Amino acid sequence: MLKARFGGMKPRFAGVVSDNCPRNDAVVAPPKKSPSETVRREGADEVTVIEDFHRIKRLPPYVFAEVNALKAAARAGGADIIDLGMGNPDMQTPQHIVDKLVETVSKPRVHRYSASKGIPGLRRAQAAYYARRFGVKLNPETQIVATLGSKEGFANMAQAITAPGDVILTPNPTYPIHEFGFLISGASVRHLPTSNGDEFLAAVSRACRHTVPKPIAMVLNFPSNPTAMTATRDFYAEAVQLAKQEGLIILSDLAYAEIYFDGEPPPSVLEVPGAMDLAVEVTSLSKTYSMPGWRIGFAVGNERLIA
């Protein structure tokens, strides 16, 4: 039902075009539009009421809010719901992490403002993780920033690199922020079929040839939310080569890096030689350590994009 409602139909909101549109279609951002206003008279005064907000109007319905409303209605009717929706772990956060938090909050200095890009020790820990897990060397001073979860990191990156009229390539179906971050910045989104092989890369190449203006970035999300599809290093190598050829930025969402079942840990796009020239990757502690409410994530990669 959800696929039919949200993933399987042509988008009906501003700034989105699916890959099944005619190849010579131009994809452009909607024209600038001033908020419509109505005037309500109150005594001798005129009060202006703003009815529309341009950026908010560009966003489609938030799928999780709609699903939650359906679940609430079903539960109110007595249904026993097994929730397979949002990736919201219900396992206990590891005890040593909780104990460290309890110890730390008793120190007055931790309640002051933090460094904007995250405290040095946290960024060094992320650099050590990438070196250990992926064999990727990162400079914690210039290539890592701590974020309020991977979602906030992705949204901020999307808004930092795009301007009204820019075109971004995103998989479909995908996690909402992969579109929302760009739409709210005034950019346009072109959907490509979610795939971990030649089909996706061919769609990227085709979109770069036939989209006006030419796309500036593509989104990768493996392991994929919501499909659980994974990617190989070979796929990433081809994606990086294509991005270099077409002048694209790669934004990779690796929030599910540590959830796998076949003995093959998901790779990072940054393992590919040359990826650091054009890619930024976001990760999260939410899924790895069952800490979604803590809001801790990272954006790592190209120095200029991270800065």
Task: List the model feature ranges, each with a label.
Residues A74-G77, S185, Q245-E246:
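Helix C-cap/helix->beta junction micro-motif
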Residues A160-F182:
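Conserved PLP-anchoring active-site segment centered on the Schiff-base-forming lysine
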Residues G7, A14-G15:
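Intrinsically disordered, low-complexity tandem-repeat regions
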Residues R190, T194-G263:
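Active-site phosphate-binding strand-loop segment of PLP-dependent enzymes
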Residues E46-G149, N156:
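N-terminal small-domain helix-loop-helix segment of the aminotransferase-like
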Residues E271-A307:
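Conserved core segment of the aminotransferase class I/II
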